[in-house]
C-alpha cells in the first residue's frame, strides 16, 4: 500500500470493503459516493477524497461498480487468501476472541494461542480447534509457520516483555489490547484497542450533549 495514504483513510479501507460486500449481497450493481457515505455515516467528499488516493475508481455521474470495488478492496486488504494470526493471553478478552469467528466475515483466523505455561488451557485445543501452547514455546511453533501477526491480550505489566518476545520470534504486526504504549522497532506495526479509553470518550460526548 502507498505509504502516502493518510492513516485516517487507511483505517476506513476495511469499512469500505464491508460496505461493498453488503451492497453486492443486496444485488446493488452501482453505488454513488452519497450512498457509500450514508452507509458509513460520513460525508461524500470524504469518500471521494479517500478514493482519489487510488486513482480512477469510478466515473463522475456513473457511480462506482460495486463488484469491481469489492474485489479492489479485497486485494488491498489481502482478503483473497486466508491470513493466520496468533493470540497471546488467554484471559477474559483472549478467550472471547478465541471464540470469535473472524473467518465468517473475512479470511482471517486465529490458528494458535499462547499463555503462561501454567495456564489450565495450555496443552488443550479450543472447541473451534485452536491449539493453546505455553509461551515458552513461541519460537518453536512460529519457526515453521506463516504467522506474522499477533493479537496481544496480556496484562499491561507484561505487555512490553511479551511484545519483545514476539518481535524476536519474527512477528511483524501486533494488535494490542493492553493500555500501554509499546516501544518496538520502527518496522513493527502496532495497532491499539483501548476499551476503557473508548468508553470514557463515549461517556464524555454523552455528557456534552446533556
UniProtKB/Swiss-Prot annotation:
Keywords: Cytoplasm, DNA-binding, NAD, Repressor, Transcription, Transcription regulation. Its main location: cytoplasm. The keyword Signal does not apply. It is found in: Cytoplasm. Transmembrane segments: none annotated. One of its GO terms (cellular component) is cytoplasm. Residues 15-54 bind DNA. GO terms for molecular function: DNA binding; DNA-binding transcription factor activity. NAD(+) binds at residues 89-94. Gene3D superfamilies: NAD(P)-binding Rossmann-like Domain, Winged helix-like DNA-binding domain superfamily/Winged helix DNA-binding domain. InterPro entries: CoA-bd, NAD(P)-bd_dom_sf, Rex_DNA-bd_C_dom, Tscrpt_rep_Rex, WH-like_DNA-bd_sf, WH_DNA-bd_sf. Belongs to the transcriptional regulatory Rex family. Modulates transcription in response to changes in cellular NADH/NAD(+) redox state. Homodimer. This is Redox-sensing transcriptional repressor Rex. It comes from Streptococcus agalactiae serotype V (strain ATCC BAA-611 / 2603 V/R).
Amino acid at each position: 500500500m502507498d505509504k502516502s495514504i493518510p492513516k485516517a483513510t487507511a483505517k476506513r479501507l476495511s469499512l469500505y470493503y464491508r460496505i461493498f460486500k453488503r451492497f453486492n449481497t443486496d444485488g446493488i450493481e452501482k453505488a454513488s459516493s452519497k450512498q457509500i457515505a450514508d452507509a458509513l455515516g460520513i460525508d461524500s467528499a470524504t469518500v471521494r477524497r479517500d478514493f482519489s488516493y487510488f486513482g480512477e475508481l469510478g466515473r463522475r455521474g456513473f457511480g462506482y461498480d460495486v463488484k469491481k470495488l469489492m474485489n479492489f478492496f479485497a486485494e488491498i486488504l489481502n482478503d483473497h487468501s486466508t491470513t493466520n494470526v496468533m493470540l497471546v493471553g488467554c484471559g477474559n478478552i483472549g478467550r472471547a476472541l478465541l471464540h470469535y469467528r473472524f473467518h465468517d466475515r473475512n479470511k482471517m483466523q486465529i490458528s494458535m494461542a499462547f499463555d503462561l505455561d501454567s495456564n489450565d488451557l495450555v496443552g488443550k485445543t479450543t472447541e473451534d480447534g485452536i491449539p493453546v501452547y505455553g509461551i515458552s514455546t513461541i519460537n518453536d511453533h512460529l519457526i515453521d509457520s506463516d504467522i506474522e501477526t499477533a493479537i496481544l491480550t496480556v496484562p499491561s505489566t507484561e505487555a512490553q516483555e511479551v511484545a519483545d518476545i514476539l518481535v524476536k520470534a519474527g512477528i511483524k504486526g501486533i494488535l494490542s489490547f493492553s493500555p500501554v504504549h509499546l516501544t518496538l522497532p520502527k518496522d513493527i506495526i502496532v495497532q491499539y484497542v483501548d476499551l476503557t479509553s473508548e468508553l470514557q470518550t463515549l461517556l464524555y460526548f454523552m455528557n456534552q450533549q446533556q
